[in-house]
């Protein structure tokens, strides 16, 4: 949600992000607050891929890419970006009239098998949060589909090594069913860190998540 601002001048922010050297990014719901052409202009200023596999325009991810692969120490990292499907409930219709917002669950069912097959480590970057308590499974909000993080874990934890979340502005760093889960606060106040160990045959173990 920090990618664009109401000043209608995104260059100062994107310049900072480019200097930080991110491998990929994902859009949040507030990125749509200032119309689609401005958002696309901002994305084009970035030197890394912005992933959003579940928001579609002309039969493809509206950012141009939903999945990205890159190498770290000989390991293939496969990443998919997803954003809460609930944006049409808040946003001005004219700003998003060319877009289709799909469920993160629906998109993962389609894309995750291939992503898992091609990757040593699978990272799901989801601008959405958790609709249920991670320990008890009890609902923490109305189950509207705005947040699908708990259901993502329930259905796909065997195929996901890292689940990066957001939207709810919570401080979460934990491991559930061998999936590292982080949600590093809001407004750039926290940084999430996940440390992996791996063997020569590329068997990956999560060492820490904080």
Language model feature labels by segment:
Residues 1-210:
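Acidic, metal/ion-coordinating pockets
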